[in-house]
C-alpha cells in the first residue's frame, strides 16, 4: 500500500513518485491549494492538493483531522521561503495525484494542540499514543530493550522465562491472586518478582540468567509505580557483589551513552547509614549539594535538651541545613517551610540568618537567638561553614524524624532556589543496609527480602545479635530514583532457615511457602547474587518524562484501573461459581 514512510522522505527523493499511508494531522485550505500535514509513526510530511486537479481536490475538501488516508504523488522541493527547518521533511512536499480515504474519524475527544487531562488521555489511549511525544518514548523504550539484550548476550547471559502463574509467597507487597478452576479453592499468584525461580536456576547450574519480565504488586501507587511493571532481572553464580555492581554499572553507562550521548562517571558508593545521616534518605538526589550537618554535640548541654523539649530516653538528633545565600528568604517563606516539615512530624523548624559573621550574635537574626552565646554560635558557623548571607535551618527531634524532615526540606529548597542541577546525572550505589528492621512491637522483618545474605557475621553471632546484622545488598540510585536493588543470596540451607526464624516465619509456614527452595538448597547450591532494575523508571529518566505512565503503552491509573477497557470489572456469576468464589457484601 505504500513505498515510503512520511517522515523518511528527503531532498534526495525530489521528482520520485511515492505512495504514502497515514493520518491527517492538519488541514489548511488556501483556496487554490489544500495543504495537508500527513503523519505516520516516522513523522510528518506536507501534501499539496491543487485546484487544477479538481477531481482529487474535491475529494480533499472532505478531509478532517485523523482521517486515515493513502496518497500517491511526486516529491518536489519547496520554495526557500516555504521551507520548515523545524521538521526533517521541511525541505520537500508531496504533490498529490491520487487520494484514497481509507477511513474517516469522529471529532476527537482529545486536542493535540494543548495539554489534555490524564483521565481523557488514558480513556482514549489509542488516540493519545498517536502523539509524537508518547510515540517517541515507546521508540526509545524499544531501543533500550534492544541494547540490554545485546549487552547481556555478549556477556554470555541466557534469557530464560520464568512462570507467571506461581505460588503466593510473602515478599512484602500484596499478591494478585488467580483462582484455579481445576484445583477447587486453590489460587495461583502473579509474581512480584522471579526471585525464587532465578535462585532455583542458579542451583540448576544456569550460570548466568537474565530476563526482561513483567511483575505484579498490589500496592498503593504513585507517579513512578504501576501495579504491573517491567524489570530487568539478573542472577549470576560465583560472582561477588562488587562484580555484579560493575556489570550493572557498565550496562547503565552504555544505555546513557547510546540514548543520551552522555558519558557517566564512575558511580560513587556510600553506606545506608551515611546516606541517612547526610541526606535523610536512602535514595539521595546528589544533583543537590546540600547536606545535613549534625550539631548534636554542640547542643549537648541540658539547657538545650530542655529548650528543644527532647526526651532523653529517645534516640534524638539535632541537625541543620546550610542554605547558601538564603538569608533573603522572607518570614512567610520560612513559615511555609515550617508547615512543610510538620508534615513529616517535625515539631518546629528553627532558623539562623547570618548577616555578618564577624559580629557574632549581633550579626544574626534567629528564632533561637535567646539561647545562643558567642561560643555556641562560633561552633555552629565553623561546623556548617556558613558565610554572610546564608541561612541555617535546624530541627531537634527524634533521629528518624530529623532525618526525614531535613531530607525532604533539602529536596524542596533545592528545587525552590534552583540549587538542584537539573541537567546533571548523579548515579550512586547505596550499600551496607541493615539486615533487619524492627517495628513498634519489636518484631524483626527483612529490609530487602529474606533471601539476602548477611555480610558481617556468622550464624552464631546472627542468632544472638540480629539487630547488628548488615546485609550484603545494594541499591542503585539515579537522581533520587531507586533504579534497582539486589544482593548476594543465602546459599546455605541452615542460614536460610535461621533468617526465616528471626523474622518470625514459623517452621510450618517455611515448609508450606518455601519448602521447594529449602529442599533445593540442600543439593550443592552455589554462591550466587543478583539484581533487578526497573525498566520503566530507566525509560522515564532517559526520556525526561515526568510520569512513568508516559513510557508505558497501556498504563493504569493511580487507583490501578484501566479507563480504556474499564477494568477491573465484574464477571458473570457462572464463572464465579465454577471457581467457588462468592461476593461478600462490604
UniProtKB/Swiss-Prot annotation:
Q: For this chain's UniProt record, which GO biological process terms are given? A: aspartyl-tRNA aminoacylation
Give the reaction(s) catalysed. tRNA(Asp) + L-aspartate + ATP = L-aspartyl-tRNA(Asp) + AMP + diphosphate
Q: What is this protein called?
A: Aspartate--tRNA ligase
Question: Subunit structure, briefly?
Answer: Homodimer.
Instruction: Tell me the protein family, please.
Output: Belongs to the class-II aminoacyl-tRNA synthetase family. Type 1 subfamily.
> What NCBIfam families has UniProt attached to this entry?
aspS_bact, PRK00476.1
Q: Where does L-aspartate bind?
A: 171, 217, 448, 489
Record keywords, A-Z: Aminoacyl-tRNA synthetase, ATP-binding, Cytoplasm, Ligase, Nucleotide-binding, Protein biosynthesis
Q: Which compartments does it reside in?
A: Cytoplasm
State the gene name recorded for this protein: aspS
Protein's organism: Buchnera aphidicola subsp. Acyrthosiphon pisum (strain Tuc7)
Q: Which residues form a coiled coil?
A: none
- InterPro entries on file: Aa-tRNA-synt_II, aa-tRNA-synth_II, aa-tRNA-synth_II/BPL/LPL, Asp-tRNA-ligase_1, Asp-tRNA-ligase_1_N, Asp/Asn-tRNA-synth_IIb, AspRS_core, GAD-like_sf
Tell me, what does this protein do in biology?
Answer: Catalyzes the attachment of L-aspartate to tRNA(Asp) in a two-step reaction: L-aspartate is first activated by ATP to form Asp-AMP and then transferred to the acceptor end of tRNA(Asp).
Provide the residue span(s) of the region labelled Aspartate: 195-198
Q: Which GO terms describe its molecular function?
A: aspartate-tRNA ligase activity; ATP binding; nucleic acid binding
Q: Which residues cross the membrane?
A: none
Q: EC?
A: 6.1.1.12
Instruction: Give the residues the record marks as binding ATP.
Output: 217-219, 226, 482, 534-537
Q: Which GO terms describe its cellular component?
A: cytoplasm
Amino acid at each position: 500500500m505504500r513505498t515510503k514512510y512520511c517522515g523518511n522522505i528527503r531532498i534526495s527523493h525530489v521528482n520520485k513518485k511515492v505512495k504514502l499511508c497515514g493520518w491527517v494531522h492538519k488541514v489548511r485550505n488556501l483556496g487554490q491549494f489544500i495543504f495537508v500535514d500527513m503523519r505516520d509513526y516516522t513523522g510528518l510530511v506536507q501534501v499539496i492538493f491543487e485546484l487544477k486537479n479538481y477531481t482529487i481536490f474535491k475529494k480533499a475538501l472532505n478531509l478532517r483531522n485523523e482521517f486515515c488516508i493513502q496518497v500517491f504523488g511526486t516529491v518536489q522541493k519547496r520554495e526557500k521561503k516555504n521551507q520548515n527547518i523545524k521538521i526533517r521533511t521541511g525541505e520537500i512536499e508531496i504533490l498529490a495525484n491520487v487520494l484514497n480515504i481509507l477511513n474517516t474519524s469522529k471529532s476527537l475527544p482529545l486536542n493535540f494542540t494543548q495539554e489534555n487531562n490524564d483521565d481523557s488521555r488514558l480513556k482514549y489511549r489509542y488516540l493519545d499514543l498517536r502523539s509524537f511525544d508518547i510515540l517517541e518514548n515507546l521508540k526509545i523504550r524499544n531501543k533500550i530493550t534492544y541494547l540490554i539484550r545485546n549487552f547481556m548476550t555478549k556477556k554470555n547471559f541466557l534469557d530464560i522465562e520464568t512462570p507467571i502463574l506461581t505460588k503466593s509467597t510473602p515478599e512484602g507487597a500484596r499478591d494478585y491472586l488467580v483462582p484455579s478452576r481445576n484445583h477447587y479453592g486453590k489460587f495461583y499468584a502473579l509474581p512480584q518478582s522471579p526471585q525464587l525461580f532465578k535462585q532455583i536456576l542458579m542451583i540448576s547450574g544456569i550460570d548466568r540468567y537474565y530476563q526482561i519480565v513483567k511483575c505484579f504488586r498490589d500496592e498503593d501507587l504513585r507517579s513512578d509505580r504501576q501495579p504491573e511493571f517491567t524489570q530487568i532481572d539478573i542472577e549470576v553464580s560465583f560472582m561477588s557483589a562488587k562484580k555484579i555492581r560493575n556489570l550493572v554499572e557498565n550496562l547503565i553507562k552504555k544505555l546513557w551513552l547510546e540514548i543520551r550521548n552522555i558519558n557517566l562517571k564512575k558511580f560513587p558508593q556510600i553506606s545506608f547509614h551515611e546516606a541517612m545521616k547526610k541526606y535523610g534518605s536512602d535514595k539521595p538526589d546528589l544533583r543537590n549539594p546540600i547536606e545535613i550537618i549534625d550539631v548534636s554535640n554542640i547542643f549537648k548541654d541540658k539547657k538545650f535538651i530542655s529548650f528543644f523539649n527532647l526526651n532523653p530516653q529517645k534516640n534524638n538528633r539535632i541537625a541543620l541545613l546550610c542554605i547558601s545565600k538564603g538569608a533573603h528568604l522572607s518570614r512567610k517563606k520560612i513559615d511555609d517551610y515550617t508547615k512543610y516539615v510538620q508534615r513529616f512530624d517535625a515539631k518546629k523548624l528553627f532558623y539562623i540568618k547570618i548577616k555578618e559573621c564577624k559580629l557574632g550574635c549581633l550579626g544574626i537574626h534567629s528564632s533561637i537567638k535567646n539561647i545562643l552565646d558567642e561560643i555556641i554560635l562560633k561552633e555552629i558557623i565553623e561546623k556548617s561553614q556558613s558565610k554572610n548571607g546564608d541561612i541555617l535551618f535546624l530541627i531537634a527531634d527524634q533521629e528518624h524524624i530529623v532525618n526525614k524532615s531535613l531530607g525532604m526540606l533539602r529536596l524542596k529548597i533545592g528545587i525552590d532556589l534552583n540549587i538542584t542541577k537539573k541537567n546533571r546525572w548523579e548515579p550512586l550505589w547505596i550499600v551496607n543496609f541493615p539486615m533487619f528492621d524492627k517495628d513498634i512491637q519489636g518484631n524483626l522483618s527483612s529490609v530487602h527480602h529474606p533471601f539476602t545474605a548477611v555480610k558481617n557475621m556468622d550464624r552464631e553471632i546472627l542468632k544472638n545479635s540480629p539487630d547488628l546484622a548488615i546485609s550484603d545488598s545494594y541499591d542503585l540510585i539515579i537522581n533520587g530514583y531507586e533504579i534497582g536493588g539486589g544482593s548476594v543470596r543465602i546459599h546455605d540451607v541452615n542460614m536460610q532457615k535461621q533468617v526465616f526464624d528471626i523474622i518470625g516465619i514459623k517452621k510450618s509456614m517455611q515448609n508450606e511457602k518455601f519448602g521447594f527452595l529449602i529442599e533445593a538448597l540442600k543439593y550443592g547450591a552455589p554462591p550466587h547474587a543478583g539484581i533487578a532494575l526497573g525498566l520503566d523508571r530507566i525509560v522515564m529518566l532517559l526520556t525526561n518524562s515526568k510520569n512513568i505512565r508516559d513510557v508505558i503503552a497501556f498504563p493504569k491509573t493511580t487507583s490501578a484501573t484501566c479507563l480504556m477497557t474499564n477494568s477491573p470489572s465484574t464477571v458473570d456469576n457462572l464463572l464465579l461459581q465454577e471457581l467457588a468464589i462468592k461476593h461478600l457484601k462490604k
